[in-house]
Amino acid sequence: MDQIAFNELAGWVTGAGLIGRSEGELMTGFCRRVTEAGIPLARALVILDTLHPIYEGRALLWRSDMPETGEVREYGRTNEGEAAENWRRSVFFHLLQSGETMMRRRLAAGDPVDFLSFRQARDEGMTDYLALIHPFAAEGVIGEMDCVYSSWASDATDGFDDADVLALQRLAPFLNLAVKSAALARMAGTLAETYLGRDAGRKVERCGAPRATAPGYRF
């Protein structure tokens, strides 16, 4: 990916986040543009915790064989039982505990498949796998929303080249910030409907609360 393509993609996802695209729209548009820029992306996953009494978070999934129809899945708690065991065996848990921010496995080149997601990717024909974690600073944490996890897989014969990996590392924060913004907007709407009622909550979302004024100033 050359610098022009990088700038265009970073600009697109930033603008899409600002105008209020949904998480699914952001994921689909981003991944499609990544492949159009020449990166052999076949699978992508972004995970972000949420503020919900039942669901722990949302997973955004994209596949190159269904480029226009990304999937959004909500998942339950992972703090007990089999879900907790699976979480503790995951590459994302390893990154979170180790303080590392990236792990790559060249699956077709014989790299170790030491986590379940690597084995699953290899069995699905993936040749390269990149896992990333972007933790928030303390002041950016909201409840359990403390980082964004993502994974990127290729099924090309030679997988990703080093320039592809670098581009994904540099572009992922743009997508993550846009997804975080969309998630917060969605959660704000849910809270408004919960505490104000559906009609009043939607009215606040559409119209906003009255703007504050101060002597000599208008906001």
PLM features: residue spans?
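Signal-transmission linkers at sensory-effector interfaces
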Residues: M1-I19, E25
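Regulatory loop-to-helix N-cap segments in sensory/regulatory domains
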Residues: F136-Q169
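Helix-loop-beta substructure at the N-terminus of cytosolic sensory domains
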Residues: I19-G70
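Regulatory sensory and allosteric helical modules in signal-transduction proteins
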Residues: M66-L130
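Juxtacatalytic helix/coil linker segments
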Residues: A185-F219
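Signal-transmission/dimerization alpha-helices at domain junctions
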Residues: S154-D158, A167-R186
